[in-house]
Amino acid sequence: MAQRLKTYYLENAVPKLMEQFKYKNIHQVPKLVKITINRGLGEAAQNAKSLEASLNEIALIAGQKPVVTRAKKAIAGFKIRQGMPVGIMVTLRSDRMYAFFDRLINLALPRIRDFRGVNPKSFDGRGNYSLGLREQLIFPEISYDSIDQMRGMDVSIITTATTDEEGRALLKVMGMPFRD
């Protein structure tokens, strides 16, 4: 599946983007660099089972073991001490990145209830796109019986695009369903 999207990018997306933005060199064409999946776990400080469940879910979704992010400073208002687990994240590159992106746009996003497309304004000004997902059940790897609680995640797609317009064109050519 990863090869399918990568060959599509090389054979179809690159010529379209070169024509659209009048690039002189093939290396000027924007491409995907990495995808990071992040999940903040507020309840992980009190509940070790939720941390373990989240680690397993993200590992299934990403195909790679996530790393636990820990609190840098103690915050009394949130009942957090320094070094406590506060979230998990995984960074996907190369083939795993293309495989995840393919599953995200073709399988997961269409399974969202009342889905009309992703927000085209969620770019950061430098061609990178961020997307928040409210539940993990949209991925086919997660079964309804195996989850104890609905948890969302943040997906950031980092590209070599220098402007939002280039980043939007890249993701649109790759198949990202933007809302009109």
Curated annotation (Swiss-Prot):
GO biological process, one term: translation
GO terms, molecular function: rRNA binding; structural constituent of ribosome; tRNA binding
GO CC terms of this entry: ribonucleoprotein complex; ribosome
Xref: InterPro entries: Ribosomal_uL5, Ribosomal_uL5_bac-type, Ribosomal_uL5_C, Ribosomal_uL5_CS, Ribosomal_uL5_dom_sf, Ribosomal_uL5_N
Assigned keywords, A-Z: Ribonucleoprotein, Ribosomal protein, RNA-binding, rRNA-binding, tRNA-binding
Database matches in Gene3D superfamilies: 3.30.1440.10
Coiled-coil blocks: none
Function: This is one of the proteins that bind and probably mediate the attachment of the 5S RNA into the large ribosomal subunit, where it forms part of the central protuberance. In the 70S ribosome it contacts protein S13 of the 30S subunit (bridge B1b), connecting the 2 subunits; this bridge is implicated in subunit movement. Contacts the P site tRNA; the 5S rRNA and some of its associated proteins might help stabilize positioning of ribosome-bound tRNAs.
Family: Belongs to the universal ribosomal protein uL5 family.
Assembly and binders: Part of the 50S ribosomal subunit; part of the 5S rRNA/L5/L18/L25 subcomplex. Contacts the 5S rRNA and the P site tRNA. Forms a bridge to the 30S subunit in the 70S ribosome.
PANTHER family: 60S RIBOSOMAL PROTEIN L11-RELATED
Protein's name according to its UniProt entry: Large ribosomal subunit protein uL5
